[in-house]
Amino acid sequence: MIGKLKGVIDSYGEDYVILDVGGVGYQVHCASRTLQALPSPGQAAVLSIETYVREDQIKLFGFRTDHEREWFRLLQTVQGVGARVALAVLGTLSPADLASAIALRDKASVARTPGIGPKVAERIVTELKDKAPSFANVDPTVVHLAGDLDDQRAPRPVRDAISALVNLGYGQPQATAAIAAASRGAGENAETAQLIRLGLKELSK
């Protein structure tokens, strides 16, 4: 199996790069974000590789980091997500953004991926929710609150405060993080207006 390739960029295709390694050109399929980050033809590049062997072909998938490759593998543990869909997700969200979206139950961010419907986005978030926090630098308090919101266990003032921030134009993850921080400072009995005020203060930092 090929685990890493180091060579010179020969050319680019729509969803792949040809990497010249010692005179042999390897066609490596990559996410759009990865392709955009690679250098111009003629320059050196290193890619972590995931090798797929089928009866009729060998296909190489390339990643800038081992961490990105691990996400590629993890995404494919979700029902209905194959290599093509996994690459599309990684083309839309960085590994850090994907981890945060899953940890915060942010289905909308995942659903921005071309070709991903709401049902697949929900499966990704649901099936990977217990694995994502270990990949993400997300405050455990925020993750806990996101879970409470998802299960309708969060107090009404907290839900209303987050909804108010979302209506003001903030994203669901931003609003959840801000109100989680506000809740820690205000205590369990805080009213909606107080949480909104403290949440906006957090967002202005």
Curated annotation (Swiss-Prot):
One GO location term (cellular component): Holliday junction resolvase complex
Keyword tags: Cytoplasm, DNA damage, DNA recombination, DNA repair, DNA-binding
Pfam families, A to Z: HHH_5, RuvA_C, RuvA_N
Chain residue ranges for the region called Domain I: 1-64
Chain spans, region Domain III: 154-205
Subcellular location: Cytoplasm
GO BP annotations, alphabetical order: DNA recombination; DNA repair
Region (Flexible linker): 144-154
Keyword DNA repair annotated: yes
Region feature (Domain II): 65-143
GO molecular function: ATP binding; four-way junction DNA binding; four-way junction helicase activity
Record's comment describing the protein's domains: Has three domains with a flexible linker between the domains II and III and assumes an 'L' shape. Domain III is highly mobile and contacts RuvB.
Similarity section: Belongs to the RuvA family.
Subunit and partners: Homotetramer. Forms an RuvA(8)-RuvB(12)-Holliday junction (HJ) complex. HJ DNA is sandwiched between 2 RuvA tetramers; dsDNA enters through RuvA and exits via RuvB. An RuvB hexamer assembles on each DNA strand where it exits the tetramer. Each RuvB hexamer is contacted by two RuvA subunits (via domain III) on 2 adjacent RuvB subunits; this complex drives branch migration. In the full resolvosome a probable DNA-RuvA(4)-RuvB(12)-RuvC(2) complex forms which resolves the HJ.
Protein task: The RuvA-RuvB-RuvC complex processes Holliday junction (HJ) DNA during genetic recombination and DNA repair, while the RuvA-RuvB complex plays an important role in the rescue of blocked DNA replication forks via replication fork reversal (RFR). RuvA specifically binds to HJ cruciform DNA, conferring on it an open structure. The RuvB hexamer acts as an ATP-dependent pump, pulling dsDNA into and through the RuvAB complex. HJ branch migration allows RuvC to scan DNA until it finds its consensus sequence, where it cleaves and resolves the cruciform DNA.
Protein name per UniProt: Holliday junction branch migration complex subunit RuvA
Organism of derivation: Nitrobacter winogradskyi (strain ATCC 25391 / DSM 10237 / CIP 104748 / NCIMB 11846 / Nb-255)
Lineage start: Bacteria, Pseudomonadati, Pseudomonadota, Alphaproteobacteria, Hyphomicrobiales
GN (gene name): ruvA
